[in-house]
From Swiss-Prot:
It comes from Homo sapiens. It is an enzyme of class 2 (transferase). Residues 3-83 form the GST N-terminal domain. PANTHER family: GLUTATHIONE S-TRANSFERASE, GLUTATHIONE S-TRANSFERASE A4. One of its GO terms (biological process) is xenobiotic metabolic process. This is Glutathione S-transferase A4.
């Protein structure tokens, strides 16, 4: 039996959370080795385990994969979450890239100065409501299907759901003007593999707290 994927990252969301989401959506069990000290990072670097000297890193199928998007693409392609043809894969990739631009604001938010964090919440809300959510609302309204591409679950759906739910933690009514996205979010959240991931006790990480921020600084600051 093939070894389970092993994820190397601090014990928090960051750029690894999307990987956790996609593995969970695909129904793949995985292990985690949490980085807690600089010494653990140096050991990975000195052992030539990190191609570009940085995490996230995922051990899977005999490989040590780095670079978040490459990891996501590999897992999605392996588990039929990356479309049935070139056109579908291109659409999925385009939607994922746009959503990751929005998600990046959430990833960096806990590392801002306290005075800047509330301003950034306003900025995130504006970008979501004006730039990103109208695009996905139009797509769902236009084709009348349950998923963004090919009428089946894809990487694009998983990353968008992750981003929507993370935004709702900060802005509970963020979808109030988007009825199709509201329905879409409920449907996706009830897919059995995703529903299990959203339940207490799963490997889904909680919102970043001061302990996580301090740990990240201690590991990665020069």
């Amino acid at each position: 039996m093939a070894a389970r994927p092993k994820l190397h990252y601090p014990n928090g969301r960051g750029r690894m959370e999307s990987v956790r989401w996609v593995l969970a959506a695909a129904g793949v069990e995985f292990d985690e080795e949490f980085l807690e000290t600089k010494e653990q990072l140096y050991k990975l670097q000195d052992g030539n385990h990190l191609l570009f000297q940085q995490v996230p890193m995922v051990e899977i199928d005999g490989m040590k994969l780095v670079q978040t998007r490459s990891i996501l693409h590999y897992i999605a392609d392996k588990h039929n979450l990356f479309g049935k043809n070139l056109k579908e894969r291109t659409l999925i990739d385009m939607y994922v890239e746009g959503t990751l631009d929005l998600l990046e604001l959430l990833i960096m938010h806990p590392f801002l100065k306290p005075d800047d964090q509330q301003k950034e919440v306003v900025n995130m809300a504006q970008k979501a409501i004006i730039r990103y959510f109208p695009v996905f609302e139009k797509i769902l309204r236009g084709h009348g299907q349950s998923f963004l591409v090919g009428n089946q679950l894809s990487l694009a759906d998983v990353i968008l759901l992750q981003t929507i739910l993370a935004l709702e933690e900060k802005i509970p009514n963020i979808l109030s003007a988007f009825p199709f996205l509201q329905e879409y979010t409920v449907k996706l959240s009830n897919i059995p593999t995703i529903k299990r991931f959203l339940e207490p006790g799963s490997k889904k990480k909680p919102p970043p707290d001061e302990i996580y921020v301090r740990t990240v600084y201690n590991i990665f600051r020069p």
